[in-house]
């Protein structure tokens, strides 16, 4: 009996379908399915630096010009525009935000032996848009209390969870959204003194050293081995850097046109060793808060007294929680799942 042959067009369709399935499987593995591990490649030194808390009656220590192990680090942040798009800071936006009348309301003022945290809600109107943001003024007794956590306690791609869930799992007092390291292969990831990845890609990198100092680096100026030798405690890769290391807004940012626009935001800032700012700006909520541009965020961090500041993953991911309760107002009530958080552990 003679077999019926399929027409050429049917064979072509079948080949295309098979190819599409193969491509889909590859994309599923690379970009959707979780790929994780709990093992780091190297450990840096422990964060043993100790700081006097304000209630203990000691003044703030001056910022050190050295990183971790006392190996000389740059006395100011490194700037280069070779690897990423250079977008000028918008002076009109900066001026409008700086001139906006801010109303501050204290929400939380908590003191423990580990940390002293004061969270304020600040409201203002700039460029005819309402803005609501939350600034956590954080003093820690040791750098070891500025901690990070991965979603599901796993390092890897496509592993996500809500900020609230990660905060609860890690018994955090204060927690904010992190840098979403798991969305890219080109990131430097150092967390709680453990090295997971050394590749900075093309984004600015922010490093918190074990001595409590914090510095930002352009990707072209960043060397992972150097900062590890200097005692890197945390390293984040999202950006851009928002201030120049001396409390000034830079002339330009390493960013994208989209990121520069009005968005909800999360940022971390450095005032002095042991003294930091965690900031979340609500946005994309008509009549409540629009969000801020990158230039406005930089001015905000300057007004908060920071010398160095760094933009974290914002948008729907931006969220702040304290003792399990939402401080900010994430989009949709819970926000979006994310790879990681930055947090201060609760007193046990």
Name each model feature, range by range.
Residues 174-178, 216, 308-314:
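General beta-strand structural signal in soluble alpha/beta enzymes
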Residues 2-200:
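Zymogen propeptides
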């Amino acid at each position: 009996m003679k077999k019926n042959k399929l027409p050429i067009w049917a064979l072509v369709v079948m080949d295309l379908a098979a190819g599409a399935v193969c491509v889909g499987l590859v994309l599923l593995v690379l970009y959707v399915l979780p790929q994780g591990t709990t093992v780091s490649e190297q450990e840096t030194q422990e964060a043993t630096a100790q700081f006097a808390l304000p209630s203990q009656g000691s003044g703030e220590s001056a910022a050190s010009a050295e990183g971790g192990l006392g190996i000389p680090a740059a006395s100011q942040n490194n700037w280069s525009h070779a690897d990423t798009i250079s977008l000028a800071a918008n002076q009109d936006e900066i001026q409008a935000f700086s001139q906006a009348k801010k109303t501050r309301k204290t929400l939380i003022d908590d003191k423990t032996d580990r940390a002293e945290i004061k969270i304020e809600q600040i409201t203002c109107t700039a460029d005819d848009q309402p803005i609501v943001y939350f600034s956590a003024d954080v003093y820690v007794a040791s750098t070891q209390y500025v901690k990070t956590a991965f979603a599901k306690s796993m390092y890897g791609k496509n592993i996500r969870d809500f900020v609230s869930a990660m905060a609860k799992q890690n018994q955090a007092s204060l927690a904010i959204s992190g840098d979403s390291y798991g969305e890219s292969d080109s990131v430097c990831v150092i967390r709680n003194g453990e090295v997971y990845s050394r590749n900075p890609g093309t984004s600015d990198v922010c490093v918190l050293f074990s001595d409590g100092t914090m510095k930002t680096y352009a990707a072209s100026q960043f060397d992972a081995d150097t900062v590890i030798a200097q005692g890197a405690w945390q390293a984040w890769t999202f950006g851009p850097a928002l201030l120049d290391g001396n409390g000034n807004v830079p002339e330009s940012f390493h960013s994208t046109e989209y990121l520069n626009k009005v968005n909800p935001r999360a940022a971390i800032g450095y005032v002095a060793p042991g003294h930091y700012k965690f900031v979340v700006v609500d946005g994309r909520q008509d009549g409540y808060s629009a969000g801020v541009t990158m230039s406005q965020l930089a001015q905000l961090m300057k007004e908060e007294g920071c010398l160095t500041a760094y933009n974290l993953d914002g948008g729907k991911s931006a969220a702040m929680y304290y003792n399990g309760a939402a401080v900010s107002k994430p989009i949709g009530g819970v926000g979006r799942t994310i790879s990681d958080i930055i947090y201060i552990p609760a007193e046990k």
